[in-house]
Amino acid sequence: MIIFGAGVIGEITLHACRKRGIPVECFVDHRIKGELLGVPIVTLAAAPDGDIFLTSPNIQDMIGPVEERGLRWQSCGDVIKDFDISGIDFQSINGSNQSSKYSIEHVKYLIRTCLHLHDNHMHPEQLTVQSIDLMVTERCSMKCRDCANLMQYYEKPENADLNEMLQTIDTICEKMDEIYEVRVIGGEPFMNKELHLVVEALTRQEKIKKVAIFTNATIMPRDEQWPSLQHEKVRFFITEYLQSRKLQPLIEQLEKRGIAYVSEKANGWTECASLEKHDRTVPEQEAIFRSCCAKNLATLADGRLYRCPFSANAFKLHAVPDYSEDYLVVSDA
């Protein structure tokens, strides 16, 4: 057996296979090199013939290349759905070949997400989407030179209009059967003093299953915001920088209030904020799109649904031509 994906779900799949006595010959991964728990990691081209478990929540991105390679694929859910992960010390290799620890709670969250999205893919009659990034502000408490969301280019950053956001949320939920997760982003979301009102609107929607708030831990939520954040759908994703001066008080409050969170250090930096003409060929553009880590991060901004945050902000900054085919006006859907 082969496992496509050497991340945490791939590691869980390996443990489940070993428990069931299923031999695993190798992992397939194009970002991670070396081996994981004694199993070699190879490229898809170098993989042997046989059956392969797909472990990415974005299962559709794996199916095409696997079928072109002539391999028979299965969802990893076939082996991890009822697998008991208690007692396992989870450590997976990330894209920088460094160990990254995961709490059992977060591992279970990742498993549920993967299984849910695989199940949705197997039932295409439902109009579902894995995640939508909701951009609540252009304002940020940091000024990262190569910010992937292009915040460094806003000369007069503003918060998103609250009424427009609430109307857009209602409209898009009317059109969809399910949105698994809405990712609340900025800038820094807590620069918007009305953030809690947005979170309230999101958690009220039955079709929205999870609400993720991405923060750099430089700003504490206001007292009046906490009640809205204390919802079973809400989870904080904290990126730790040297400037994350509110990290410890924030974590203390999250734990005190029973709010789920994941906190990880910013271990590396990707230079992906170049606004310039590259003169690439169509095949080169297609190759870049296939390998893009953000191509499934649909983004809501100013009443429009874009393919990713970079695209949304490039349009807002008038840095790219305004092609109507590149976004969806939600009110017209």
Predicted regions located by residue number:
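Structural motif
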Residues: 4-8, 30-31, 53-59, 77, ...
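Acidic (Asp/Glu)-rich catalytic clusters
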Residues: 172-176, 225-232, 254
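C-terminal accessory region of radical SAM enzymes
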Residues: 258-271, 310-333
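Phosphate-bearing ligand-interacting subdomains
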Residues: 20, 32-101
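Conserved alpha-helical substructure of the radical SAM core
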Residues: 102-213, 220
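Glycine-rich adenosine-cofactor-binding loop
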Residues: 1-17
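Hydrophobic "anchor" residues
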Residues: 305-306
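Non-cysteine beta-strand/loop elements that form the S-adenosyl-L-methionine
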Residues: 233-243, 262-266
